[in-house]
Amino acid sequence: MTDNTILIKDALILNPLDFKEIKGSLLIKNDKIAEIGTDIDESNVDKVIDAKGKILLPGFVNTHTHLSMTLFRGLADDLSLDSWLNDNIWPMEANLTSEYCYIGALLGAIELIKSGTTTFSDMYFYMEDVAKAVEESGIRAVLSYGMIDFGDDEKREHEIKENIALFEKCNGMADGRIKVFFGPHSPYTASKDLLEDVRWLANEYNTGIHIHVSETQKEINDSLEAHDLRPFEYLDSIGFLGPDVVAAHSVWLSHNEIEIIKRNNVKISHNPCSNMKLASGIAPIQDLITNDICVGIGTDGASSNNNLDLIEELRTASLLQKVNLLNPKALTSNEALAMGTIKGAEVLGLEQEIGSIEVGKKADLILIDTNNANMVPDSSATSSNIIYSANGYNVDTTICDGKILMENRKLTTLDEEEIYKKARKAIEELKEASK
């Protein structure tokens, strides 16, 4: 069997491990980075990509989203989280089918690929159909079933069976691009019994946990009333936390909770645009980073963002910390770019495979075209130009697992127009069913 080889030639290579800028080339063999240098032999290469004027980066890592909810983009804007969920999203979700979730996931996958995200972490329903969309699109994913029981024993057993079935069917699927976590929705929708069961299951299956924690002030107040403890204090008291836990949002944190997060090596997914849009609050990201806590970036769903552009999310994260702390040096462009790449990979336990440009790592890579009005002149550091000037439309090429998913802004694995047509039809049907 011969190797499939791609040479990315004459790029400006930026590695988020050290932020050194190298003008050179990179050779991909099959699914991995095989060589990085300035004089790579191209005589026997299957394909050469001319990357002059382009920045070569690791693919972005979106550590928290709900891909199928891309169908709900713009559905319930300008509302609080409580009203958004209870009065709009949950009633609409009651009419979801596996086909709708599949279409929504395909639509989301298009947006991810076209804005340079090669890996995403998702918690939702009908996740086997999301896995199908992942397999077809060519991207990488960490999937979990959103487990909610509200203290109902029968419901708890059902939710556990659903997530176990997802693990047994989909973990390692799509040539190993899919990894499955357990996904208790939150401390306020998952009972103590469910949370304790999930902790045991994650240990038993040697996998991670994906959960929403401390997203709103109401959640804090409700937790104090129910348990006389804040959410992270409560989770710590029942032995739930650990280095395999990814806590999305983590907005309202006390000093004690930051210590709890650090002691348990919990990973954090920061979702600034969603937190701003729902007026949930501003997460203390600079404090977390200063305390050596691993923080990645997430978009949340397009229903509360309203897009999946990770460059926009990283810029927002940086600017939000600066204005909140009145410190222009808070969350620098280097720190932000690391959040979107190597730190995101670490959040998902994938830092040995993706997130940086190193020989032997998976060939999850993107090219950003600097020959655009918003990128000229490029007199600042490259990371600054990406974080403060670029957007997803500047991504020219997206490669995942050594396969080209987009080149010259053209997708290679998905039929955009057909998916757009199906998505428009699906949301109209859902609106009609929800009347």
Swiss-Prot record:
Assigned keywords, A-Z: Hydrolase, Metal-binding, Zinc
The UniProt record lists the keyword RNA-binding: no
EC number(s) per entry: 3.5.4.41, 3.5.4.31, 3.5.4.4, 3.5.4.28
Any Pfam family hit: Amidohydro_1
Residues that coordinate or bind substrate: E93, H185, E215, D300
Catalytic activity of the protein: 5'-deoxyadenosine + H2O + H(+) = 5'-deoxyinosine + NH4(+); S-adenosyl-L-homocysteine + H2O + H(+) = S-inosyl-L-homocysteine + NH4(+); S-methyl-5'-thioadenosine + H2O + H(+) = S-methyl-5'-thioinosine + NH4(+); adenosine + H2O + H(+) = inosine + NH4(+)
Residues that, per the record, bind Zn(2+): H64, H66, H212, D300
GO biological process: S-adenosylmethionine biosynthetic process
Obligatory cofactor(s): Zn(2+)
Key word Cytoplasm present: no
Enzyme class: hydrolase
InterPro entries found in the cross-reference section: Amidohydro-rel (IPR006680), Deaminase_MtaD/DadD (IPR023512), Metal-dep_hydrolase_composite (IPR011059), Metal_Hydrolase (IPR032466), MTA/SAH_deaminase (IPR050287)
Co-factor remark: Binds 1 zinc ion per subunit.
Record-stated family: Belongs to the metallo-dependent hydrolases superfamily. MTA/SAH deaminase family.
Function: Catalyzes the deamination of three SAM-derived enzymatic products, namely 5'-deoxyadenosine, S-adenosyl-L-homocysteine, and 5'-methylthioadenosine, to produce the inosine analogs. Can also deaminate adenosine. The preferred substrate for this enzyme is 5'-deoxyadenosine, but all these substrates are efficiently deaminated. Likely functions in a S-adenosyl-L-methionine (SAM) recycling pathway from S-adenosyl-L-homocysteine (SAH) produced from SAM-dependent methylation reactions.
Further remarks about this protein from its record: SAH is a product of SAM methyltransferases and is known to be a feedback inhibitor of these enzymes. As a result of this inhibition, organisms have evolved efficient enzymes to metabolize SAH via different pathways. The pathway found in methanogens differs from the canonical pathway, it uses the deamination of S-adenosyl-L-homocysteine to form S-inosyl-L-homocysteine for the regeneration of SAM from S-adenosyl-L-homocysteine. 5'-deoxyadenosine is a radical SAM enzyme reaction product which strongly inhibits radical SAM enzymes.
Subunit comment: Homotetramer.
Entry protein name: 5'-deoxyadenosine deaminase
Name of the encoding gene: dadD
